[in-house]
Design a protein with these regions (language model features):
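An alpha-helical, amphipathic repeat domain used for nucleic-acid recognition
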Residues: 1-163
Length: 163
C-alpha cells in the first residue's frame, strides 16, 4: 500500500514541471503542448497558466518551431505543400507556416530539390530505354506530388531529367 501511495505522489508533477520535462525531448507547438497536458489530466486553468509561462519565457515559440521544421523538412526532400500541411497538423497557424516557408524556401530551391528527388527516383528504376516512358514519368510525378512539390516544380523536374 505504501509503495502505491509513493508511486502516485511521484507520478503527479506540477503542470509546469510536466511541460518542461516534455520540452527536454524537443521543441513543441502550442497545440501539441496543450494536447499533451490535457492528456496528462491537468485542468484548463492550470494549462492556461502554464502556457502563458512557457510562451513568456520563449520555451514555446511557434515561429521558431516552424523555421526549424522547414529546414529539417527541406533536408529530407519534402516540398512546400507537404511542409505546410504538416505544420498545420501540428497546430501552427497558416500565416506562420507560410512565412517560415517563404523565409527558407524559394522557387529555385523547390525546383532543385524536386529535380534531385526525380533523379533519385530515376536511378531506382531499372530501365534500358533511352527515353523515359509516359508510365515512368507518371510514376516520378506521383512521387514528387507525394513529397509535396508543386505541379510546376514537378513538370520542370521531369522535363530536365536526363536519361
Amino acid at each position: 500500500m505504501e509503495k502505491l501511495v509513493k508511486k502516485e505522489a511521484k507520478e503527479k508533477r506540477s503542470c509546469k514541471d510536466e511541460a518542461l520535462f516534455w520540452l527536454e525531448y524537443g521543441d513543441r507547438t502550442e497545440k501539441e503542448m496543450v494536447q499533451h497536458l490535457k492528456k496528462k489530466g491537468y485542468d484548463e486553468r492550470e494549462i492556461a497558466e502554464c502556457m502563458a509561462f512557457l510562451v513568456d519565457l520563449s520555451f514555446i515559440d511557434d515561429n521558431r518551431y516552424a523555421l526549424k521544421f522547414v529546414e529539417v523538412s527541406m533536408e529530407k526532400g519534402r516540398g512546400p505543400i507537404r511542409i505546410r500541411h504538416e505544420l498545420q497538423e501540428k497546430g501552427v497557424a497558416g500565416g506562420i507556416a507560410d512565412e517560415a516557408i517563404a523565409t527558407i524556401y524559394d522557387r529555385t530551391t523547390e525546383r532543385e530539390l524536386a529535380l534531385e528527388l526525380a533523379e533519385k527516383a530515376l536511378r531506382g528504376m531499372d530501365r534500358s530505354e533511352e527515353r523515359l516512358s509516359d508510365k515512368d514519368k507518371a510514376k516520378i510525378a506521383r512521387k514528387l506530388a507525394a513529397a509535396g512539390f508543386s505541379a510546376g516544380a514537378t513538370y520542370d523536374a521531369i522535363g530536365r531529367l536526363k536519361r
